[in-house]
């Protein structure tokens, strides 16, 4: 794995990067960077169309953390409702699912913001350690955009 953090706008990275960010199972996209993701990629409509009963499946199966690939966006599901807060456990489970998707789809480059640490209030040192630990045995390049 190649990991680096840069002071740059996430949405200026080349299009060969997949973009990762956090969402909730209800696909609520009203605050934070997810608003820009939705505006650029029409994610809420696409996810609701593709996964109309996702929240019930997630709750029934007690998944805890997940990741849904839509186009070039990796949607890390770290909480049930938009107003909930994720835990480092749900973040870890979502990151593990993202790794699985990367391996299945031969995804080699991911760019992401400082996930889970804005409105969600996780500690970035904890989250970045999870990312490094989970992706350590891969050849995926992870670029964290800190602007």
Describe the role of every protein-language-model region:
Residues 1-147:
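Macrodomain-like recognition of ADP-ribose-binding/processing modules
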């Amino acid at each position: 794995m190649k990991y680096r953090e840069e002071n740059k706008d996430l949405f200026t990275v080349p299009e060969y990067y997949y973009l990762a960010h956090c969402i909730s199972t209800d696909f609520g996209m009203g605050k934070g960077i997810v608003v820009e993701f939705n505006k650029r990629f029409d994610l809420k409509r696409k996810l609701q169309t593709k996964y109309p009963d996702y929240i019930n499946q997630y709750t029934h199966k007690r998944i805890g953390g997940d990741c849904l690939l839509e186009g070039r966006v990796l949607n890390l599901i770290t909480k049930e409702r938009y107003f909930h807060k994720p835990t480092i456990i749900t973040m870890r489970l979502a990151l593990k699912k993202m790794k699985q998707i990367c391996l299945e789809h031969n995804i080699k480059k991911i760019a992401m913001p400082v996930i889970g640490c804005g409105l969600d209030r996780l500690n970035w040192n904890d989250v970045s350690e999870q990312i490094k630990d989970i992706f350590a045995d891969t050849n995926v390049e992870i670029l964290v955009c800190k602007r």
